[in-house]
Amino acid sequence: MNRTKGDEEEYWNSSKFKAFTFDDEDDELSQLKESKRAVNSLRDFVDDDDDDDLERVSWSGEPVGSISWSIRETAGNSGSTHEGREQLKSRNSFSSYAQLPKPTSTYSLSSFFRGRTRPGSFQSLSDALSDTPAKSYAPELGRPKGEYRDYSNDWSPSDTVRRLRKGKVCSLERFRSLQDKLQLLEEAVSMHDGNVITAVLIFLKRTLSKEILFRELEVRQVALRHLIHFLKEIGDQKLLLDLFRFLDRTEELALSHYREHLNIQDPDKRKEFLKTCVGLPFSAEDSAHIQDHYTLLERQIIIEANDRHLESAGQTEIFRKHPRKASILNMPLVTTLFYSCFYHYTEAEGTFSSPVNLKKTFKIPDKQYVLTALAARAKLRAWNDVDALFTTKNWLGYTKKRAPIGFHRVVEILHKNNAPVQILQEYVNLVEDVDTKLNLATKFKCHDVVIDTYRDLKDRQQLLAYRSKVDKGSAEEEKIDALLSSSQIRWKN
């Protein structure tokens, strides 16, 4: 749709937007004419038939009448003309860029719309509109630059750290200088948030050389501890070793080097690697553990090769009845001892696979040795070996049963391995505490132990109560009846 020249002039005279011009001079006369045209354009929004209802404004700055009525009419009719104005805006795209009226003109209506009063004026337009709903006629200003910072990533180190702490996504690539990166790290440390510190350290690890990173972290112990923990978690042993070497932490360097054996699967290669760890500067306690680890793996390799040969030959009874379910290689010391007690219990002390040899070589405590050997021999139901395990002789040749782990634990392990009642009763009787003995005997149905204990306690009432728990007509019931009818026992109740 083509517009005539008159329509275009009417639009620019009536619109609150101004056409683009290259003339930057502040012409007082042109501003005055513009203001006059803007005021006269208000007449188009009201009924021209009634001249008495139209208030006029003189150009001397003094109000002739109330202009608020005209503005109300303008606000009421603005809705009907909104669609036409939108079409005009779409046709003139450059009109969306509003130019602020220059404040040099005393009578500029834009100054009235902003609520400003020039010196010497009697009444501002904002005062005249005080009884009407507020409506902004000023050109829309551009959004502040700060609202677009999410897109430009124009954040300071402190702002970036706060955003990271809140879980917001932001790039750290804009921090390119060493000073900015270190300030970013210091801000992260001051927040006391481990996740933020780790995120910044990952960025520094990727963008800084090792020498610069280690040098700066040496004087920042909090960040240094976080980096060490992070490297241990991700398994970056090479960088961790370089860091400890730079910090001259020999013991931690040795431990990190020792930890690398976990990545070696071949037993022979792992043994050779552990041999190189023996001479590293560990503490006295750690050095003993490293030596034991090397010796144990060396023994396991020998035992594994020998037992694999015996098992494949099929000439050894223990391997035929109980085939091996797993290899002994890289197993803990206690597991190796159990394996030795299970398959090599009767071997001479001089062999590597002998349980006694393992006990002496690795200084295994008596309690640990007895507990492991008992579990292994009870699983095989080798009750004679169990009995020999607790039988000791004094210097006079008398035998006595002694258990470093306590006979109550012996009873529980035997019951777990389905030991016969006669075996259980023998070891229940060896429990010294009476209450513990009665509880175990009742729990595992060792009736003879319960009956004999109540007899020794001369507790007739408890014996009568226990009589109802045994089977009718059983040997235990007959034994209880014989004790109750005996005149040689002086019952206490």
Swiss-Prot record:
Composition bias, Basic and acidic residues: 142-152
Annotated consequence of substituting residue 213 to P: Disrupts endodsomal colocalization with VPS33B
Keyword Phosphoprotein recorded: yes
Compositionally skewed regions (Polar residues) per UniProt: 68-81, 90-99
Location in or out of the cell: Cytoplasm; Cytoplasmic vesicle; Early endosome; Recycling endosome
Modified residues (Phosphoserine): 121, 124, 130
Cited InterPro entries: Spe-39, Vps16_C, Vps16_C_sf
A Gene Ontology biological process term: peptidyl-lysine hydroxylation
Role noted for this protein: Proposed to be involved in endosomal maturation implicating in part VPS33B. In epithelial cells, the VPS33B:VIPAS39 complex may play a role in the apical RAB11A-dependent recycling pathway and in the maintenance of the apical-basolateral polarity. May play a role in lysosomal trafficking, probably via association with the core HOPS complex in a discrete population of endosomes; the functions seems to be independent of VPS33B. May play a role in vesicular trafficking during spermatogenesis. May be involved in direct or indirect transcriptional regulation of E-cadherin.
Assembly behavior: Interacts with VPS33B. Associates with the homotypic fusion and vacuole protein sorting (HOPS) complex; impaired by VPS33B. A possible interaction with VPS33A is reported conflictingly. Interacts with RAB11A.
Involvement in disorder: Arthrogryposis, renal dysfunction and cholestasis syndrome 2: A multisystem disorder, characterized by neurogenic arthrogryposis multiplex congenita, renal tubular dysfunction and neonatal cholestasis with bile duct hypoplasia and low gamma glutamyl transpeptidase activity. Platelet dysfunction is common.
Protein name: Spermatogenesis-defective protein 39 homolog
UniProt source species: Homo sapiens
Organism placement in taxonomy: Eukaryota, Metazoa, Chordata, Craniata, Vertebrata
Gene of this entry: VIPAS39
